[in-house]
């Protein structure tokens, strides 16, 4: 029997490092460096004491704080030009259906609550093992189009995140009530709270108040004010009413420039593209080449990402040309950025069978499932594509579907087009800027 390594499917079942009931995959130095900056056991006094604390303030005392010159610019929203990370803190950058993501220095740290009653810790490793397996088996520059996590910690106690969220929520509730001269209460209406928070979050006076109260009340190096409404939707969603925010995984990634969906016309030009549509062709072509090269690997014609869409494609600096050979052609990318596929949480390849995807799919799928969804989301994200008649017409070949066989952009029926369909598609003149270096 061969020795399993991270280029083999069996790698996902290995436990290279053990710490009681937790496991670390990948680089322990990266992981331990991040963990040393987190207090997983931080707790706070009961909420009733926080309520009593805010009874010491009123509109007048808050006005005095607002008149103070001190302002912590990290409490502005990150899309605000006034935002600046003045501390080495964890800054909340995103919360989706399955993960809460923070940025610290040049790292991205993702916390994923796992349904431990459904899966064992080692059955939740696809986000680490699948891209690592692909990266180690792909031979050419196509491997540069994959985001590999540096490290992943399994089965960690993550209750501190939900506790922190509740503490910040209660602070914001009481602060807003004090500003409005209302009776203090920890009861809230989701709609009323979000309206009040969104009306104030960009106000310099409100940020001054946060600069005072967040350190005093929260006293944490985890800043969740940015995109707090997304975290609110995550924890308050009715489908998680009885959810146990107990254990999950911690994943360390390199920090990207942007996700692909954040690029507009102005940024596309700034990045060196002739137009936004040329940029869209660029990310489509790179993803297509990645899939084709994966399907060339032995036993990898079952690869599925299961969530291929613009916000799961990240952009990184590219310091040298990316050259990918396909049959008698070579695709040359001289752009100063590259796109890279991220978020393999629901992916599968070769012998790495993902129970999460297996339980969700009732019929067999292949690459076409991913690109059908990808094209739908591209057209939704970028209506500008319609201005390029040739490109938009070609993309429609991926979405010849009806309500009967497609639900929310996802195929419900099995359509197993061969990968040669995609190979022929990218040989068209649509992508002539990159075929044989544009010659």
UniProtKB/Swiss-Prot annotation:
Induction: Expressed in the late phase of the viral replicative cycle. The keyword Methyltransferase does not apply. Belongs to the protein kinase superfamily. Ser/Thr protein kinase family. It comes from the Viruses. It catalyses: L-seryl-[protein] + ATP = O-phospho-L-seryl-[protein] + ADP + H(+); L-threonyl-[protein] + ATP = O-phospho-L-threonyl-[protein] + ADP + H(+). The active site is at residue 307. ATP binds at residues 93-101, 117. Pfam families: Pox_ser-thr_kin (PF05445). InterPro entries: Poxvirus_ser/thr_kinase, Prot_kinase_dom, Ser/Thr_kinase_AS. It is found in: Host endoplasmic reticulum; Host endoplasmic reticulum-Golgi intermediate compartment. It is an enzyme of class 2 (transferase). Keywords: ATP-binding, Host endoplasmic reticulum, Kinase, Late protein, Nucleotide-binding, Phosphoprotein, Serine/threonine-protein kinase, Transferase. This is Serine/threonine-protein kinase 2. Phosphorylated in vivo. Autophosphorylated in vitro. Residues 87-439 form the Protein kinase domain.
């Amino acid at each position: 029997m061969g020795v399993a390594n991270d280029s083999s499917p069996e790698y996902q079942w290995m436990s290279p490092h053990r710490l009681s009931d937790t496991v670390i995959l990948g680089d322990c130095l990266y992981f331990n460096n991040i963990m040393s900056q987190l207090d997983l056991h931080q707790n706070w006094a009961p909420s009733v004491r926080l309520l009593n604390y805010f009874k010491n303030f009123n509109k007048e005392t808050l006005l005095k704080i607002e008149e103070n010159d001190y302002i912590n610019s990290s409490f502005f929203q990150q899309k605000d030009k006034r935002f600046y990370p003045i501390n080495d803190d964890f800054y909340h950058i995103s919360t989706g259906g399955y993960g809460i993501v923070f940025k610290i220095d040049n790292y991205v740290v993702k916390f994923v609550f796992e349904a431990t009653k459904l899966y064992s810790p080692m059955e939740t490793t696809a986000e680490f093992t699948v891209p690592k397996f692909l990266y180690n088996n792909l031979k050419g520059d196509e491997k540069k189009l994959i985001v590999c996590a540096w490290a992943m910690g399994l089965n960690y106690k993550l209750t501190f995140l939900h506790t922190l969220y509740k503490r910040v929520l209660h602070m914001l509730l009481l602060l807003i009530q004090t500003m409005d001269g209302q009776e203090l209460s920890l009861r809230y209406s989701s709609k009323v709270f979000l309206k009040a928070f969104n009306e104030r979050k960009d106000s310099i006076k409100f940020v001054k108040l946060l600069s005072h109260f967040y350190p005093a009340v929260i006293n944490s190096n985890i800043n969740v004010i940015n995109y707090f409404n997304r975290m609110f939707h995550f924890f308050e969603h009715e489908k998680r009413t009885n959810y146990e925010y107990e254990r999950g995984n911690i994943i360390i990634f390199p920090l990207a420039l942007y996700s692909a969906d954040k690029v507009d016309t102005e940024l596309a030009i700034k990045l060196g593209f002739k137009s936004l549509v040329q940029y869209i062709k660029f990310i489509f072509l790179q993803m297509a080449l990645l899939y084709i090269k994966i399907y060339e690997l032995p036993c990898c014609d079952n690869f599925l990402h299961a969530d291929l869409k613009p916000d799961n494609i990240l952009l990184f600096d590219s310091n040298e040309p990316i050259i990918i050979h396909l049959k008698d052609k070579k695709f040359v990318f001289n752009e100063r950025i590259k796109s890279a596929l991220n978020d393999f949480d629901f992916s599968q390849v070769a012998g790495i069978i993902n129970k999460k995807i297996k339980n969700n799919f009732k019929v067999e799928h292949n690459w076409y499932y991913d690109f059908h969804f990808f094209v739908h989301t591209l057209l939704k994200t970028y209506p500008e594509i319609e201005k390029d008649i040739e490109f938009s017409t070609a993309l429609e070949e991926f979405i010849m579907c009806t309500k009967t066989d497609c639900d929310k952009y996802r195929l419900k029926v099995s359509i197993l087009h061969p990968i040669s369909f995609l190979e022929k598609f990218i040989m068209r003149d649509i992508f002539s800027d990159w075929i044989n270096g544009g010659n």
